[in-house]
Swiss-Prot record:
Ranges of residues in domain PINc: 6-132
Single GO MF descriptor: magnesium ion binding
Family: Belongs to the PINc/VapC protein family.
The EC number(s) this enzyme carries: 3.1.-.-
Binding site for Mg(2+): 9, 102
HAMAP family cross-referenced by the UniProt entry: VapC_Nob1
Source species of the chain: Aquifex aeolicus (strain VF5)
Protein name in the entry: Ribonuclease VapC1
Amino acid sequence: MNSEKVFVDGNVIVDIFDERRVNHKYSVQAIRILLANKFDLLTSSDLITTVYYVLSKIDKKKALSDIKEVVNILEIIPFGKAEVEKAIELMEGDKNFKDLEDTLQYVLAKKEGCKLILSNDKSFYSPDIEVLTTEEFCERWNTL
């Protein structure tokens, strides 16, 4: 079993299930590669509700089915007051942390020892964990 941990951002999860999105094929391929190579895939508990909200705008019943699939392939990371406070502290101390949700995801990825954050948000800031879009990940994987 590969012990490498990858944090999967909510936009990647939405991209997997919404075929109309521009990064759909890259997101599906990236997750397939990661699963085939036995990476541990993680996401945060708050992203599950965000993903459901976005997908339910298209089809509520399918959105629930999609979430069931997500919880079967990704480890869902809970968080509490300490993680929220750490995210706020980072935002107050580093102007590069501009988005509370992204900063919280970074805090969780760091806490869990993730080596990579997979996000299709090109402005996702992480000072010490590599961030790749799914397209970048697929391109890099194919060159290895």
